[in-house]
Amino acid sequence: MRTRRAAAIAVVALIPVAGAALFAGLHQAGRSDLRDQLATQVTDILERSTPAEHHDHGHEFGEQAGRVVCAVDPFGFDPPTATTMAQVKWVYARHMCAITGPGAGWAVSVRASGPIAVRLGDPPLVRVPTPGAGYPERVRQLIPQRYQEEAFGEFADQDAIEAARQRFALVTAR
């Protein structure tokens, strides 16, 4: 009888712990889904930009530029409490864009990469820190303090790069 009672008490005590773990897991899955949606949205914004728009936000791809193919790895957004795309105003991400062109394969394509800030809206606004002396300070001015460590980190989403590589191959095969 004591064993059953102890087991029942243990089960009752574990219910809140299991509930909290389930909530945390669902919350994390929701944030992962939101990051995936933001990656898709920002990739689309970058890939639909004209050469002039790319020039305006710091990319210079040259006269023979073809199509822009990008990979995006979001590491933050504002407001940080957002849980849906509709609530997100700014996305902070690492990006890597490659340009298709005459005879340019993925390995030798012209690329631009690094942290970016993208304001979602109509029209969207893409901000890229300009390269050169003082670059780290310009990144710090662009990216909120809470995301700066990630802004200087490595591209974490290798699947996004592989998907961009495959899109690049499809575009250049035509």
Task: Give, region by region, the residue ranges found by the protein language model.
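Polar/charged alpha-helical tracts
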Residues: 4-5, 40, 44, 166
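C-terminal partner/receptor-binding element of secreted or periplasmic proteins
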Residues: 131-174
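Mature extracytoplasmic domains of secretory-pathway proteins
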Residues: 73-129
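Ser/Thr/Pro/Gly-rich low-complexity linker/stalk segments immediately outside membranes or between
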Residues: 26-41
